């Protein structure tokens, strides 16, 4: 029997007996085909990078069904008789790019590009769903949701959403952001071609329709029974041989994303139950709806929306469907089944939303039990029963039509609190309530809660009985909520238990309040009425971007180089490079003890796992080499742990196997023997490090300078805040492409390393030092990186070095693609720190002195931590502190060495500054905006704090920008509106904040080479790496401008003749480090120098020519006369100040839901000084993307470690970066067209990192909203309102953090106040 399917219309036929049933579609696509657009990023269905379109033909309906799936979870055998369309299948460079690819490119919606193919397919699927009569009826609402499950770490999502919305039938073209199709204010949409579903490269192939027939697969490991009877026979046979035959029932296999151990289990039998008609049907009768267990959640949603019965009952099904749309992402709902979701809840205690809402709706479950036969159970009975046996099967789920008595009304609502409003996040708690109300009395009700840290969803029967027969009053409400305290109790070990428990009273209050006879008419209003909560506003934006024609094409919004290639998936990343013959694959064994003696390593049961070839450790370092994994100018770090581990996550060994899957599986089977006897306890905090004098030396020239006399400043102060403490945690880089490398041996003891790195030069040095061979034997090649943000600097070196060491030892190519969990654990994150400060200030709010003690956790090794102190102080100096002193200690702990991440140290510095300003404002009872403004720098104070970096007075734009953003954002008007909103809304509070930034950057020596080929085309090499920041694009523009100075015919078309090529450490030496936001400037300066040399060489030819000469003719003559048309140069900023300052301001307004703690960013207005932008489209993308990454740091991303330093939030399930639904709803950016600055590269300034700090405006606005909530709570509790304003809002300000500060008992406090107030009337 064969497995037959198509990929992009190409037929594939595999003998079923030769296919491992556990093989995923992604593995087949990436390792067995040439289609590389499908990317592995998380491997658990949480990111969308691997999304493909799956098409099935229904022979009965003669119809093709198209839907997206996550290929990392979809089993290959599940796609029998299906066509898979990848982004290459939509369009490509050979056959023509699809309009989606062009649109994403034209809207500047692709930066690193790793996520873009998945985005393309997700959008295409949404357009197909909305396709009517060959044109799209997609709405802007549907367009925004099209990519709501796809993650992007670069763009900030705004341009992606605009690209999606550009296909919508109801879009206002003036609402679309900067793009290459039409100008702002243009009303002609003819340049935006309508979507045509037929215009794609690949459609469902006719040959597959003939393949679809019933087959007998019972003799194979993969079985696809066609009836319940056939399935029953298979189950009985498996049960009879259960001691020797393991078995797995397969529907969508999406559970593997959450229960990752399933990947390692090799079952004897996989039984596909999706081809059984009875299990796929949805049947409606007079009693309700019966849904087959393998019906996908997406189909359930569609069916429930179509039910037409009495309005009350119809509303129940509509709300069930709406809630289900928040379960996982669309591409998971398309393949995940309703039965599978409930089985996970029953068997594995999965925190299911489905179980909770169906429990409230009174659902039944029909099962086929191997021991009891056919049974019909209430969902409650099903959940409470002992876990289903492997051979038991859920047949269907029944949802009844509720019939209420005459004159009674049905009320049904569902609720969930989760980090992401649109879904793709497990709930902290979910709930669903059904009530029948006659007149004003509750006849009966069903109250269900789940996902709060309990075995399964439950009904609160005690409260149901209490409410039955009662009219809802404040007193009844209070008593019902009081009863909840003994019911919704999370089990030990549940995260945020108090927060989860506090959500239950809020949800019940919301629901029961709608049933009250006379809803409260108090002022302020309660904010929850009979109307359902309004949906989140759609994303809107504006961009005010100056176009500079002075240095054309520099200054133009040129589309990013290779953006369409990235969208189609043809852009090649390291893991896309075809594996050489005999290639092996590696995976890291890392330490799980912070400080322990390593006794040895073996595998479980002392059996060598399948496919393992070798285990590489420090013992395999060759003679003459060193155990070095990272070597930079200021030090080195070891590749493997020696006799002792120094931190959790430290590399101990490198397992090499015949496949990546076997290597990863072997790591999970590895057992490291540790011993801690006679060892000192590990150092796990900065306090312990200081106590034990475990500190790294800070190089004197990197230690920041203090300003003024703080003792004098403190003496001049009217007020002082002494020894106040701030703690800051970490943040994971979360590039979409994890660490990856490929090492291939070459002749004469040489080796070629393909590395996804920001530092090819340092990778080269590290590999050479480890192998004990000269650096000219090591060639490091990097074409592009799927996101770096600093995480691909130091942390990329040991990955490449391990591959090179294994390749040299085994004399075979070795590659690795580090899985997401390992990457998160071994990469580390931002530097955690503890800050203690004392500050003196006048009664006006003017600050006179600031003293700080800063303890920075560098981890177990130095890395790039030496730069953190100066960066931190640099951003903190954005205010005039009068005098500034500090004692900074770089602490050496037994925690993982920290990575540097976008704005390293700077983002912490800006938070510290804002926390101090907020504290001063609270202590003086003054508006915080007043305190900020009064302490902004003059140019004189700026020069005192920043020395040469301050520049000339005309370069200091911050004070004018502060006023300008106040006007453009209507700040003062909105402050009044926010105040009025807070006075009239009890359960929602708003805050608004204006924040400045100053960001100092350094220029580095940067190499470049420009070569003109005989046909007039141009090749450019630079030391910098394209990470998505538009480096190649700006370099192309600069090359075109600089060579265009010749002003011969054809130079205006030079841009299309230029190609920037990959970085090669042997070809382009002194490449240094791509980071610090100035690589683009430095590279542009370097190629400009090269071009100036070429222009000088070509000028004599032009002068000797008779009349006008074209570019191609000029180059032909140059070749004929042996003119050197290749020029190299090294840009060095030695003749100018090596540093300059970047300025920006932002106003953000937020709204906080006091019941859940959810913060919605209503609007952000950014004004950023880019000088004269080299490419405003690229810089705009950098500003928005950086800001949203900062939003993650300040508001969303919880980096949680256990007491020994092991990362617990190690997956997309637990670590939540921003998504489409968490960015500002109104996102406005203006780029200030700064003046001319001769000492900078064409007067440009950096844009990559500084805007990240502006996200502090969201955090500060949230604090203002929380402050208003705390005032209200103090009033209810009869406490002094001023006590509620003195608090610190931690980072990140997640929902649990915000809710706790607003009051976990806010509902109870309100009701107690209300009852007490009424009793005094």
Curated annotation (Swiss-Prot):
Cofactors, names only: [2Fe-2S] cluster; FAD; Mo-molybdopterin
Tissue-level expression: Weakly expressed in roots, leaves and seedlings. In seedlings, mostly expressed in lower part of hypocotyls. Detectable in seeds and mature siliques at low levels.
Family affiliation: Belongs to the xanthine dehydrogenase family.
Co-factor binding comment: Binds 2 [2Fe-2S] clusters.
Quaternary context: Aldehyde oxidases (AO) are homodimers and heterodimers of AO subunits. AO-beta is a AAO1-AAO2 heterodimer; AO-gamma is a AAO2 homodimer. AAO2 also forms a dimer with AAO3.
The entry's keywords: 2Fe-2S, Abscisic acid biosynthesis, Auxin biosynthesis, Cytoplasm, FAD, Flavoprotein, Iron, Iron-sulfur, Metal-binding, Molybdenum, NAD, Oxidoreductase
Protein name per Swiss-Prot or TrEMBL: Indole-3-acetaldehyde oxidase
Gene field: AAO2
Swiss-Prot/TrEMBL catalytic activity: indole-3-acetaldehyde + O2 + H2O = (indol-3-yl)acetate + H2O2 + H(+)
Domain 2Fe-2S ferredoxin-type: 1-90
Residues where [2Fe-2S] cluster binds: 42, 47, 50
Native organism: Arabidopsis thaliana
